[in-house]
Every structure is written in structure tokens, then in C-alpha cells.
């Protein structure tokens, strides 16, 4: 819903880059490297890339510039107004400037041969392989791609829980449009395969807890296949699906009760509260959350039935009586 009036004048955009972004501790404390490294992170919104960021920074001894367009949104001088005017849709109004700052920060960091951690969705494998990765390699960077394998019901919960928790804690959250979430989720496996075909960089896949599940240097599978299999495997773990079902129930409760507790949101006033309820209804958030709850409940119940049948089959080795799950 952004329009041209939301985009900063060129001079102000560049001033903020010089005076705020390029003077941040993350940038100025990172030193030039003889053999700089770039770790490109991929995953749909809510997948849990934050854990991979921390892991990558630790591997690089905290000596790296982290590039995350979402973190750069806060530098927009009108961001507080946007959050008040559009509690759900404000991030779109900062998108153009934040994306440009991310590109400009990358250019500045690579010019000084600083290590990079690039937090992205990796939804465009062609651009990533032919422009981003190739450009970094031409500048002497050792490049690696790391992706998070998170099933859609998990990442969707991550997006929604982040929004509600931050709204309760600080008065605002960052929502990601449903269409964007759906598109990115579907594109990631294809993007990984495109990168694998068009470049020689290692591709590694991790789960949300940071455990490595795949390394293209040692696994004959295509990364897209490995990602899909890892996503699906997560939903076959009954302990995981039970936990996710309980987590989604909390989200259902939050959205159902929003009209009753909206006045408790910090740093808000009646105008902001009314706008939050208006956008919440317009985007049919409660319906979306309810559908996710229904999805994980079905998977969780099926998983329980499979476990029951498996136990029965095992017992049948000793006794022939087994009651099918009702």
C-alpha cells in the first residue's frame, strides 16, 4: 500500500545511509579481510533465520556486517507514523528505502572486504546466482548459502507469533502479507536448485534449532529435494506437531480476544487501536489463523493415529488382538 510520498527524497535517503547505517557498530567494528567470507541465508518469513544469523556471526568471531532489510526499516524517519497509521501494513511503506539501504550497505561492505551475513528470503535463485553470488566471487569472496527447512505451518506461526508478541510488548509488530509468504515458501526449493546448477557454492540446510540436515558437498540430492524432505519430516514428529498445535491455539485465542484486550496494548491510543482492529478485519487475520489451526490439528491427529497403529502392529507380533484407533 506504499505510494511515492512514502519514499524518502534522494538526499535524505543518502544522508541516513552515511550518518546512521554506515556508522553503526556492526559496520565500523568489522574489519577488512584478506579472504572475506559471505554467508547468504535463505528462508521464508518466520522460518527462523535469526538462529542462523547468530551461528554465522559466532563462526566469524562477530567480525561481519549483517545485512537485513527488515532491520533497516527502523531508520526511516516516518516509521513511527507508519506504524500508527497502518499497524499491520506499515512495513510495506518502508520497503523501497529499506531495500535500497540493504543494497548500498552491501556495496559499502564489499568495497572494504568485510565479512558479510546476508539475511534474505532467496526467492529469486537466478538473481542470487547470476548477480549476487557471482558479484561477490568476482570481488574475492568465499560464498556459502544456508537455508532453513521449516514447514509452512511452522513459519506461518513464526510470523504471527512475532507480530502478536511484539504488539503486546512494544505496541507494534511486523506483519508479512499472506501472498508474499505463500510465494516465497514455494519459490525457495526452486531457487536453491537454480543456485546449485548455476554456481559452485556450498549449500547447507538447517532446521530451526540450527542442526545441519544437508550439505551439497556431501549429499547427492538436489538441495530443493532435500529442503522439501526436511520440511515434511518435521511434520511427522508427533512431539513437534503437538507443540505446534498448542502454539497455534494460543494465536487463535489472541486474535479472538483482540477486541477485548486491544486497550491494553502499550503506547497505543484509541485511534491506533481502532486502526489495528480495522486492518485486522480487512486482512481476515482471524480466518487465516483458524485455518492454520485446523491444518496442524489434522496433522497432529493423523500422526497420533499412525503411532497407535504402529504400536498395535508391534504388539501383534506377540498377540493378535488390536483395536483400530477410533
Where are these regions (language model features)?
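N-terminal pre-Walker A segment at the start of P-loop NTPase domains
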Residues: 1-30
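Non-Sec secretion/translocation targeting segments of pathogen effectors
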Residues: 1-3, 296, 301-326
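Walker A (P-loop) phosphate-binding loop of P-loop NTPases
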Residues: 45-46
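Conserved nucleotide-sensing/catalytic segment adjacent to the nucleotide-binding pocket
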Residues: 61-137
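Hydrophobic positions on the alpha1 helix immediately C-terminal to the Walker A/P-loop
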Residues: 52
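Conserved GTP-binding G-domain of TRAFAC-class P-loop NTPases and closely related GTPase folds
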Residues: 155-295, 300
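Conserved phosphate-donor/acceptor-positioning beta-strand/loop module used by diverse small-molecule
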Residues: 137-159
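Conserved lysine of the Walker
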Residues: 49
Amino acid at each position: 500500500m506504499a505510494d511515492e510520498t512514502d519514499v524518502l527524497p534522494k538526499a535524505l535517503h543518502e544522508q541516513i545511509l552515511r550518518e546512521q547505517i554506515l556508522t553503526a557498530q556492526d559496520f565500523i567494528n568489522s574489519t577488512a579481510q584478506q579472504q572475506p567470507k559471505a554467508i547468504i541465508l535463505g528462508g521464508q518469513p518466520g522460518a527462523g533465520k535469526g538462529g542462523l544469523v547468530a551461528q554465522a556471526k559466532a563462526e566469524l568471531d562477530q567480525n561481519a556486517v549483517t545485512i537485513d532489510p527488515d532491520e533497516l526499516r527502523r531508520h526511516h524517519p516516518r516509521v513511527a507514523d507508519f506504524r500508527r497509521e497502518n499497524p499491520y501494513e506499515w512495513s510495506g511503506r518502508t520497503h523501497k528505502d529499506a531495500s535500497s539501504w540493504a543494497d548500498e550497505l552491501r556495496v559499502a561492505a564489499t568495497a572494504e572486504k568485510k565479512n558479510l551475513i546476508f539475511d534474505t528470503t532467496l526467492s529469486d535463485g537466478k538473481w542470487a546466482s547470476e548477480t549476487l553470488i557471482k558479484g561477490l566471487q568476482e570481488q574475492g569472496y568465499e560464498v556459502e548459502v544456508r537455508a532453513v527447512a521449516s514447514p509452512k505451518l511452522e513459519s506461518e506461526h513464526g510470523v504471527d507469533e512475532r507480530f502478536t508478541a511484539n504488539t503486546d510488548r512494544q505496541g507494534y509488530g511486523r506483519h508479512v502479507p499472506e501472498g508474499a509468504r505463500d510465494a516465497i515458501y514455494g519459490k525457495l526449493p526452486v531457487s536453491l536448485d537454480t543456485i546449485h546448477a548455476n554456481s559452485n557454492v556450498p549449500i547447507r540446510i538447517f532446521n530451526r534449532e540450527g542442526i545441519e540436515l544437508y550439505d551439497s558437498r556431501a549429499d547427492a540430492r538436489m538441495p530443493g529435494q532435500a529442503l522439501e524432505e526436511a520440511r515434511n519430516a518435521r511434520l511427522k514428529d508427533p512431539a513437534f506437531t503437538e507443540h505446534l498445535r498448542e502454539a497455534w491455539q494460543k494465536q487463535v485465542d489472541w486474535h479472538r480476544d483482540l477486541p477485548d484486550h486491544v486497550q491494553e496494548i502499550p503506547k497505543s491510543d484509541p485511534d491506533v487501536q481502532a486502526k489495528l482492529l480495522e486492518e485486522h478485519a480487512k486482512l481476515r487475520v482471524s480466518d487465516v489463523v483458524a485455518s492454520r489451526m485446523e491444518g496442524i490439528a489434522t496433522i497432529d491427529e493423523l500422526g497420533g493415529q499412525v503411532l497407535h497403529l504402529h504400536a498395535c502392529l508391534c504388539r501383534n507380533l506377540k498377540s493378535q488382538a488390536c483395536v483400530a484407533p477410533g
